[in-house]
Amino acid sequence: AIEEAYQAGQRIFAESRPQELAAKVKTLEARRVELGNPAYMADIEWHFIGHLQTNKLKMVLPYVSLIQSVDSVRLLEAIDNWGRANNKVLNVLLECFISSDETKQGFSEEEVQDIVSGEKKYANIHISGVMGMATYTDDETVVRSDFRKLKQISDMLQDWIGEGGNIDTDCREISMGMSGDYPIAIEEGSTMVRVGSMIFGAR
């Protein structure tokens, strides 16, 4: 399925489970060896979009260009430490809590402010923007309101650019919208949607 999507022009793929990400990367590496073609699908960009435990970093960080789901200071610090040890700067999105579903993960707006203010520096992390998941409901008014909260946090981040904190002018990504609600997300300012179920089917 990934090869079909690639042939259709898709280059950015995302995975929510560390083991499956590592397995897919290794499968593609084996395919290149089998074909004798190191360039085969070598321009794929992998994003990680699931809950990431600190003990699974080595299964994810070597392979991804963006971690969309950084939802705690502990994880942020662990990624920064891994980057320092491996001489690599990691691109991340700060996952924000925007829904009325208390089981969802993420930072509050105040916590995001603390991170970007620069009181603690993250030298091996590049904050590329924010990510959020709306309330799982058929009520479009609620979903739209959730997405607007994330857009407001993104707008707040723009005010910090140039203030010497942990962000720069590239901090503009807003990852919101999934297979069931992406049209609303796009209307509310999303720059990145997560629509794997719509393309590849449910797991």
Describe each PLM feature range.
Residues 1-180, 188, 200-202:
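Conserved alpha/beta-domain cores
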Residues 191-192:
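Divalent-metal-activated hydrolytic enzyme cores
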